Amino acid sequence: MIDKMLVRGAKVHNLKNIDVDIPLNRIVGIAGVSGSGKSSLALGVLYAEGSRRYLEALSTYTRRRMTQASKASVEEVLYVPAALALHQRPGVPGIRSTFGTGTELLNSLRLMYSRLASHRCPNGHYIPPTLAVAAGRELVCPECGAHFYAPSAEELAFNSQGACQKCGGTGSVRTVDMASLVPDDSLTIDGGAVAPWNSLMWSLMTDVCREMGVRTDVPFRDLTEQEKDIVYHGPAEKKHIFYHAKNSNQAGELDFTYYNAVYTVENALAKVKDDKGMKRVEKFLREDVCPECHGSRLSAAARAPKLRGISLDEACQMTLEALVEWVKGVPGSLPEEMRPMAESICEAFESTAKRLMDLGLGYLTLDRSASTLSTGERQRMQLARAVRNRTTGVLYVLDEPSIGLHPSNIVGLTGVMHDLVADGNSVILVDHDTQILKEADWVIEMGPEAGAKGGHVIVEGTIADLEAKPESQIGPFLSGKAETKLRRCAGTGEMFAEGGIHLSTGSIHTVKPLELDVPKGRLTVVTGVSGSGKTTMVLESLVPALEAKINGSALPTHIREIRAEGIAHVKLIDATPIGINVRSTVATYAGIHDELRKLYARSPDARQKGFKASDFSYNTGSLRCPGCDGTGEVSLDVQFLPDVNIVCPDCRGSRYARAAYGVKLMNKAEQAVSLPQLMEMDVNSALAFCGGMKTVSQRLQTLQQLGLGYLTLGEETPSLSGGEAQRLKLASEIGRTQTDSVFVFDEPSIGLHPLDVQVLLRVFQALLDNGATVVVIEHDLDVIRNADYVIDMGPGGGESGGRVVAAGTPEEIRENSESITGRYL
């Protein structure tokens, strides 16, 4: 009986030629600090081999139509089943994607409405449900005798024939934002009061406006209503004007047509061809709910069929919990002969919905736009989609499924994993969350450190084995012996000593009207179960309100007021990847590369050969490698095989031509190194080399403080993990005085080992020491314990959430019986 997969000689990324046996039909956890090679083993070896072997069994013709995985660098992998992976960061879907389309629940629902609903004849009469629809026969109205066909499921889809004509199925329309046309009404029209004429139109428009009878030399607020109306909505008349050019002595006369302010924007919008043009127009537009479909995205015809008395758009506005109850009553509401068909359609709906409910997504409505969901919600949508077919003998690789999950939601996730194993599948789980790792039957711990010092298996065994072995780094956290409280927290009395930020909001999504206070100069953590409104409150209310206040623009519609004395900057540090192409590296992003280029240009070698700082750029300089244009890799197009990206044969991945190796820089210890060699060092080694070079060593030191000492300077930023990207974005902020800044972090502990969380807390402390106000959305209990002030949202998700349950120190939250978070602290 084969009961384990055998991996021999794995060398993917930083794996050090490791041999490991992985039990089959079990939950196997892979743990280790960030960058220790967990994902390399799980995704780079097991998933890559499992999916590649399965695809290789298909014909060339079929394979040509699929994205293909290249062979992993491993000597052999035996007994690996066909594999499915759930990645750490599902991409953010487009405007057309909703919770209903993403989970494919809407497919079953549309089918119900097409086959089982009561349809409307062209004259407006409703016909009782009939089997004739499924048979594809013509329907006849019993009242007026009209003949017509019922809509198919496709005609009820807002991404095809069922789309609302006005908004094209997106549910929102762009209209001119009147408030943005004259942002400052103390200016005169000559002084540039009408913003679109300054940026989208010739400045001559002010002269034409004067000819239309508007005074252009008085402040805009002193104009009569009639004059303002001409500015906003005046007719397109031709006027004869004299003009005098501002910067030369030329003058002349012209016939010119008047474009009012609103038409100027509409005309520019109609001519937009690219993103750059859109950016110029965008600031004069606002998104409004479509007036015809009221945001439901469906045409009037698609909203016509009724089932159990409600239309499709009304069904999509129900939460999943309510909808499941409603669907249960559908077969009983139909004539006897239609029930078997109804039951099979409803069953398909219920089985998909059950998984989503298990994962705690019952509070979402089907019409919720998928781009407004949090990372954790999108990831669980993806998980539910993968596990709803009761397969057997498949390897599921889950990359950090606990992201965005409150401790109370993890229970549903562990249930799904145990179900998969019970069906005869194997689950590989890459995670740091001790609560979810405790569910694993076997744990493999990678390490001992990150990057080049990682890639070894330090310990493997059951949870009890890890707790007992002293070399295990996660063992103390599993057994609860590790010290997790790292900083002194402010007491209740001194909490608002530096002042506070007050926010008052109306209701939005599932969040009820809120009154909220955030202490300045403290670490505030916003907690709550998934769907309790943390993202909505912080990212859609607090951040836009602060931005509006700082820029002096109008507050978002659902914000009543914001009071924030002395705040001049708000910085959102999220975990989205940095850059999309291979040209962005750690050194360029952290501003180290520019400084190094200046240093190299001053070196004796460079002066002798006549190189300037610009020559040392691997993107545009003369010293970049001509073979790959400075990207370090070349793409080969091979018929019938996937495009192969290989390391550039000329520069071997260094991005520089041979001449660059001839220019060396000498440090204090009289070691000489060329720029391509320096770019191959990690931050720690580079810091040792650049000891006496002030600016460079300061910037490298910052990266080291952020716990990124193991990254190589030439590493491309898109390949960094979420947690690494987030800390790299902070590099430019550490060390400055930040008393006027608010930093907002969205789940920064994502992908962080308990030891890395301690590094993160030190980073927060560095910001607080400089006077910053830090607001964090977080589930990690170690981060919550170290907060000065906790705002707990809830008590549940969706309709049963959306208010502040408790606010205070972590101790006060723990004693609050209503708070679900408090139970786990």
Protein language model regions, located:
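Conserved phosphate-binding elements of NTP-dependent enzyme cores
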Residues: 1-825
